Every structure is written in C-alpha cells, then in structure tokens.
C-alpha cells in the first residue's frame, strides 16, 4: 500500500476498502497485523457497522483544505473543478449525503466504480468520462499534496 504522503487519494480509498472488507469478513480481522490494527481502530471508534476511520477522515480533511487553497490559487485547477461540478452535483443529489464535499464526491465516485467493476458490471461511457475527470482532479491534488509534504 502506498502511504499517505505518496498518494493521499489512494490512501483514503484503500482505507475505505479495508473498512468494507473488515465489515464483510470480520473473522479475517486477525489475518494480518495491519488488518488486526485497523479492526481494533474501527472497534475503538465505534464504526464497525458504518462510517470511516479517523485516519481516513483526517486525510480527507487535508485533501479538502488543499482543494480550497488550489481553488483560490490555480486557475487551471479551478477550471477542471468547474467542468466536473455538474456531474458532482448530480452524484451528490443521488446520495444520502447531498452536502458532501466535492472531493469526497470524487472519491465516492471512484470507490463506487471500483465496486461495480468487482461485480463485473458495465460502466456507462458517461460515467467513464466523469471518472476520468475525477481521477485527473484527485491525481493533481495527490501530487500537489506529495510535493508539499516532501518539501517540508
């Protein structure tokens, strides 16, 4: 697994995947030390039935903060978000959390597409196009986050 500094978006998606895995297969919680530790954290944080680990939430907050900075400082980034905005608004409207952030919506989109692919379900060309745009935004954010972290 890549670490948070290497690719923060992949890190968040990985944590979400491990949370779902541990919920689906609780008997495998001790299969590796990493799974055991994540399961213990989920237990302590009271999210065995739903929700996300503080690790994931904190990483998401960092990504959202960077997103806010870039909206004010980077015209190309702002343009990419504006192109993606109608799709994000539609996605948010279809969820039980219509007020989620744009970055959480991008991550949720990619996570849901991953789940559909695991189920061997077809992805529409429109969804694939939005996936490409969301991936580009998250890639840029992750690279900028990485550059900021390694410059310290």
Predicted regions and their residues:
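Short runs of predominantly hydrophobic/aromatic residues within well-ordered alpha helices
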Residues: 8-15, 29, 35, 56-60, ...
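A charged, amphipathic interaction segment
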Residues: 56-110
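Sequence-level detector for tyrosine residue identity
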Residues: 11-14, 21, 77, 111, ...
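Generic structural signal for hydrophobic core residues of well-folded globular domains
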Residues: 15, 21-25, 42-46, 63-70, ...
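Glycine-rich, aromatic-bearing surface loops/beta-hairpins
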Residues: 92-152
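Non-transmembrane, amphipathic alpha-helical segments
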Residues: 3-10, 44-55, 69-72, 76, ...
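N-terminal interaction modules that seed assembly of large macromolecular complexes
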Residues: 1-52
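Histidine (H) residue identity feature
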Residues: 36, 43, 52, 67, ...
